[in-house]
């Protein structure tokens, strides 16, 4: 999986994308708070891993 995280100053939000080049899955999101954005990423990774099991 590849995770990209960046801050969009114009919107005042942390944005992220998560892609899996093997399965072609892609998820994305945005939050104003960095910790909430990181939590969303972690929850999404855990969800995708559990789906594959």
Where are these regions (language model features)?
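A short, charged, amphipathic alpha-helix used as a generic interaction element across diverse proteins
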Residues: 30-52
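Short N-terminal "domain-start" leader segments
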Residues: 1-15, 39, 43, 47
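Compositionally biased, intrinsically disordered low-complexity segments enriched
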Residues: 4, 15, 32-33, 53
